[in-house]
Amino acid sequence: KVGPDFIDPGLHAQMAGLPSRNLDGWMLSREYNQGLFQSCLARADLGVVEGVMGLFDGYDGTSEAGSTAEMAKWLGLPVVLVVDARSMARSAAALVYGFSRFDPGLRVAGVLFNRLGGPGHLEYLKEAMAGNLPEIPVLGGIPREDLIGIPERHLGLVTADETPLHPERKEKLVELLERYVDLDLLLERSVYPPGVTPRETGGGGRLLSAAPEAPDVSPPLMAPQQPIPSGGKPPEFLRQAPRPVIAVARDAAFCFYYPDNFELLEEAGGLLHFFSPLAGETFPRGADGLYLGGGYPELFAQDLSERTDFLESIRGAAGGGMPIYAECGGLMVLGRFIETLEGKRFAMAGVFPFGTRMLSRRKALGYTEVVLREPCLLGEPGLTVRGHEFHYSEIVEEENAAVRCAYELRRRKYSEARPEGYQVGSVLASYIHLHWGSAPIAARSFVMRCREYAKGRERHRADIR
């Protein structure tokens, strides 16, 4: 998936039976994207990259930075245009003509028409394409089908954790593709991208970039930064030291995570333990750190408020100095309460002396960059990490004296920096979803703090004995 979205990769994984990753031209360097892409594709027979917004939409109207087009060129991929042809016939060919000529450096391998009225509609479209763009094949045309629609809500589509792709919907999707798309031609138009060695079996290593022709969300407004060095692997002595256990809440309430962040934690020596608060689970007593990702705690606020063992264990861990890192929904759970749109308040962990309130309108959306201004779980002052924020809630009843901010946040190209990254003791929480691939040292720092906490507990037990 191109862009920072969490939901689409989850749906990809449900359909493909394999993890899906985020490629991002703003949060991550060109080298990082290329390395991730090549690593994943080397283990597969076929890869598909879904675009973000429209093909050429990026952070502004003057360049391709952060766009699907940029990513296709970085990775050496042809593009399949997915065109919503509802209420269009010959005009669809004009649309494809403009997209295929807009950037001579991009190769459009074919077009797939969507939401058609019937077989006659597809024939009109094929005639228009053959008469004006014979070099761009029509790969197929999907008719309108209500059954395959995925429900939407605030923050986007319903997530994979809530199983919107039930078996009947999956079967219908497969049936439509097999019936209405020329899959052989699609594979024929795919390529072996640079730097990828095809697998010995199957058709391995081919890849296409699928891009919608029109945007559906506002583009980000920040300029891309220069490539960020990966920082290399952690020192050998760190990877061989006893592995600290990092508990990760993961279910429908906590479902916004980048798989890269998990891998970076493991590469730094962390041992991840996943648990589901909604299923009544809490993190193990032997945990040395806690990671609370974003998601939809507001939809499960009553359930979470009734999971008193979970909330009390968080309070106890925070009071005992355990490193706890939380993002967005995780921040909400660490507050005193979550207030719903109906005005109901549900008690949460109370680690921070403020609550959060849901809003009917979006509070924030866009790419962000944070600069550490104080030492914290993620590193020392001066470190820059990139991410994004997207939320419909805000902090309320804040007692500023009790909370320090570890970050300086820059959200837009010309906006003033503001404090973020709320810190109390060993707890760090923020509305920002950080991608540690932009600064792997952040993951290593968190693991180091967890390791130090584990050693401190061992010393305490030894003193007692």
Could you say what each language-model-derived stretch is?
Residues 297-377:
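Cysteine-nucleophile active-site neighborhood
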Residues 48-50, 80-82, 112, 247, ...:
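Structural motif
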Residues 148-201, 211, 221, 229, ...:
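Amide-donor transfer/coupling interface in amidating biosynthetic enzymes
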Residues 1-75, 79, 83-110, 119-123:
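ATP-dependent carboxylate-amine ligase catalytic core
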Residues 244-308, 312-317:
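Phosphate-binding active sites in nucleotide-utilizing proteins
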Residues 77, 136, 319-322:
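A short helix->loop->beta-strand "cap" motif at the edges of active sites that frequently abuts
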Residues 89-200:
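Internal gly/pro-rich beta-alpha loop/helix module
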